[in-house]
């Protein structure tokens, strides 16, 4: 690793003219100077990686190191270096979005060693190149969106390309490295990353400790505007809060009071503009004897907006907002997107209207958080994958008690647990969840994915402060045995940048319900903090605390302005239901763009949201990797842009589960993964003006 220095903006005056005169013989003095975009705050950190000891894709770990179950460590666990944190972040984030098991496909269908044609030819897969790191801000010092550009040594300045890799979830800046960054680097493209203004920013309130752009720690006061995130709380309020609620944490997505999701499209465009600046710095003509000029202007570089989940939604939003030609095309997987639906839009499956579609996340996530623990008790869901560290008896008790409380509140019908659970599941179906995702209702709640999302997004959509303890929830360290809030044996802050995902529970920081001292929300009451879950639901249903306006601010119009685009999503997705995301987006796109649309949609049967879960018993036998099709979609788009090959039409891809014994499914083969067809026949998805009809 070689530090090339810190780029900086300089106020040029009379000295510029003098330098220009002196340097005229060394370059083109008439060329336009490459100027750092005005939204870049402070300095740009530039680092070169040799592709051996360290690299862009694997942080020096290679294919083998990424697959290691043991995380890379720190020489000093209490004060890791920025290089150690970067290595841990790449290891953690790469593994978070793909199946890392050999039987599941790692090292055979994807991985640093697998080339763009799917062959094992790249060895350890280390990629040399240069990184540019900076904040984007509005001048307040409170936005501080992390931007990162990776330029591989294989980049061809005569055939330039950029791929965005906006972070998935609320992850840090490397949050889409395996989902989009890897493909781009292998293609020789620059990668434009950003953390969407969430970025896993954590503030340990008791010690007033925050993270900086590289994950190293600082006192919040001393860090000032260099902090990735500092809670907006006065010193007096902070002291009072710490006294009453010790061992608590603020997180940027939940507690920035900025509703960052409304800016995801804009910051993705900024990441592309920053990538243009970086490429001009590397490959632009030299002027003034030293400075670089502009070689590439908006629209000159083939640019694919790509990512998954929240990053996929951000990519779609960016393409909609692009009015300068920054983005050429879009390829996204399982996008979390909130669509502003026209009243005449219709989603059909097998010719019949689906019961509900186009709901925003604030609606379906709070409903799922309320009902899923009860629905999971249904006998029809017996054998669902178990994704919890709690004893099975504890989990079953939670499910029974949640059903009983829901029934007492009149929210489900039935005189016994089974009838109540059946009603809860029926309500989820009526709300647009597919029966294909039934067996995932339990693991989505048991893993705490849904509770975490419900709490974080409710805070964001109401612009709540950490001291508000919205719906009596907060984030805290807990006693591992009892779940009661307690001081940690060692602060989680040194590693939060490396292993955190930005949405507690994460990195040893848990989601707690404030019953007295506070307890893990699953254990705080027999019904798993039902009162808090109901409160979150009522924020949406009763339109409280500004939630409707803030949700409206994140909606998109599904107008991609004629850009070619591919959406891929698994039919069994129980985190971001396909009826509310991809299907709804395609239907609305038919109104917003009509005949101009170049959008195609591939729906993958037996595909769900978290490929990282595919090695879990019961996931391995039932579900296939959606990531595989995301990569195929990127290849299809590349051939379309470079060779004019037509994109295969919208279709259902009928995959074949691996089967076998849970936890010991046979190895994934190409027989499980049929190709995307140029002539899908009966599997074709019909689209029209405001309509989509997906074959059953």
From Swiss-Prot:
<keyword id="KW-0732">Signal</keyword>
<dbReference type="GO" id="GO:0047989">
    <property type="term" value="F:hydroxybutyrate-dimer hydrolase activity"/>
</dbReference>
<dbReference type="GO" id="GO:0019605">
    <property type="term" value="P:butyrate metabolic process"/>
</dbReference>
<feature type="signal peptide">
    <location>
        <begin position="1"/>
        <end position="26"/>
    </location>
</feature>
<protein>
    <recommendedName>
        <fullName>D-(-)-3-hydroxybutyrate oligomer hydrolase</fullName>
        <ecNumber>3.1.1.22</ecNumber>
    </recommendedName>
</protein>
<keyword id="KW-0964">Secreted</keyword>
<comment type="function">
    <text>Participates in the degradation of poly-3-hydroxybutyrate (PHB). It works downstream of poly(3-hydroxybutyrate) depolymerase, hydrolyzing D(-)-3-hydroxybutyrate oligomers of various length (3HB-oligomers) into 3HB-monomers.</text>
</comment>
<dbReference type="Pfam" id="PF10605">
    <property type="entry name" value="3HBOH"/>
</dbReference>
<comment type="similarity">
    <text>Belongs to the D-(-)-3-hydroxybutyrate oligomer hydrolase family.</text>
</comment>
<keyword id="KW-0378">Hydrolase</keyword>
<feature type="active site" description="Charge relay system">
    <location>
        <position position="309"/>
    </location>
</feature>
<dbReference type="InterPro" id="IPR016582">
    <property type="entry name" value="OHBut_olig_hydro_put"/>
</dbReference>
<dbReference type="GO" id="GO:0005615">
    <property type="term" value="C:extracellular space"/>
</dbReference>
<comment type="pathway">
    <text>Lipid metabolism; butanoate metabolism.</text>
</comment>
């Amino acid at each position: 690793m070689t530090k090339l220095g810190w780029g900086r903006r300089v106020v040029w005056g009379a000295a510029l003219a003098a330098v220009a005169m002196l340097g005229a013989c060394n370059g083109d003095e008439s060329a336009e100077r490459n100027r750092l975009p005005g939204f870049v705050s402070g300095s740009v950190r530039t680092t070169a990686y040799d592709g051996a000891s360290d690299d862009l894709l694997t942080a020096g770990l290679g294919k083998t190191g990424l697959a290691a179950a043991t995380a890379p460590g720190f020489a000093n666990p209490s004060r890791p270096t920025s290089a150690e944190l970067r290595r841990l972040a790449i290891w953690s984030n790469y593994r978070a979005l793909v199946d890392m098991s050999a039987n599941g496909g790692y090292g055979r269908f994807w991985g640093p060693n697998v080339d763009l044609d799917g062959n094992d030819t790249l060895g350890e897969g280390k990629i040399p190149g240069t990184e540019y790191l900076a904040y984007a801000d509005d001048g307040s010092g409170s936005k501080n969106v992390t931007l990162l550009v990776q330029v591989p040594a294989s980049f061809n300045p005569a055939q330039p390309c950029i791929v965005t890799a906006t972070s998935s979830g609320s992850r840090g800046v490397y949050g889409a490295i395996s989902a989009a960054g890897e493909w781009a680097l292998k293609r020789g493209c620059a990668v434009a990353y950003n953390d969407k203004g969430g970025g896993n920013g954590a503030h340990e309130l008791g010690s007033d400790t925050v993270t900086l752009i590289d994950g190293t720690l600082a006192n919040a006061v001393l860090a000032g505007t260099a902090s990735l995130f500092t809670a907006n709380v006065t010193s007096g309020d902070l002291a009072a809060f710490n006294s009453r609620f010790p061992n608590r944490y603020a997180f940027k997505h939940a507690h920035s009071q900025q509703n960052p999701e409304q800016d995801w499209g804009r910051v993705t465009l900024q990441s592309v503009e920053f990538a243009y600046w970086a490429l001009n710095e590397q490959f632009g003509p030299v002027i003034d004897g030293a400075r670089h000029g502009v070689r590439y202007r908006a629209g000159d570089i083939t640019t694919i907006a790509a990512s998954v989940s929240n990053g996929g939604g951000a990519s779609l939003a960016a393409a909609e907002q692009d009015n300068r030609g920054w983005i050429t095309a879009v390829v996204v997987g399982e996008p979390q997107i909130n669509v502003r639906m026209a009243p005449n839009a219709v989603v059909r499956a097998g010719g019949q209207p689906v019961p509900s579609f186009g709901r925003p996340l604030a609606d379906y996530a709070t409903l799922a958080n309320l009902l899923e623990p009860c629905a999971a008790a249904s006998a029809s869901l017996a054998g669902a994958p178990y994704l919890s560290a709690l004893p099975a008896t504890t989990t079953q008790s939670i499910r029974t008690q949640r059903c009983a409380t829901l029934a007492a509140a009149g929210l489900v019908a039935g005189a016994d647990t089974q009838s109540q659970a059946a009603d809860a599941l029926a309500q989820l179906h009526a709300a647009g969840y597919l029966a294909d995702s039934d067996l995932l209702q339990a693991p989505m709640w048991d893993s705490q994915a849904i509770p975490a999302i419900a709490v974080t997004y409710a805070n964001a959509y109401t612009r709540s402060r950490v001291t508000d303890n919205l719906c009596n929830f907060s984030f805290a360290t807990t006693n591992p045995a009892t779940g009661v809030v307690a001081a940690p044996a060692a602060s989680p802050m040194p590693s939060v940048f490396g292993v955190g995902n930005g949405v507690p529970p994460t990195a040893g920081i848990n989601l707690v319900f404030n019953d007295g001292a506070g307890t893990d929300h699953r254990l705080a009451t027999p019904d798993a903090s039902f009162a808090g879950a109901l409160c979150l639901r009522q924020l949406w249903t009763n339109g409280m605390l500004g939630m409707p306006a803030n949700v409206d601010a994140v909606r998109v119009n599904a107008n991609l302005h004629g850009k070619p685009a591919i959406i891929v999503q698994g039919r069994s997705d129980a985190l971001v239901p396909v009826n509310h995301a991809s299907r709804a987006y395609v239907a609305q796109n038919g109104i917003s763009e009509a005949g101009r649309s170049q959008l195609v949609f591939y729906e993958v049967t037996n595909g769900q949201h978290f490929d990282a879960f595919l090695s879990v018993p019961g996931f391995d036998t039932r579900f296939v990797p959606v990531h595989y099709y995301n990569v195929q979609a990127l290849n299809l788009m590349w051939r379309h842009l470079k060779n004019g090959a037509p994109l295969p039409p919208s279709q259902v891809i009928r995959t074949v589960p691996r089967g076998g014994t849970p936890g010991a499914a046979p190895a994934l083969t190409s027989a499980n993964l049929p190709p995307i067809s140029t002539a899908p026949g009966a599997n074709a998805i019909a689209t029209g003006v405001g309509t989509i009809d997906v074959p059953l």
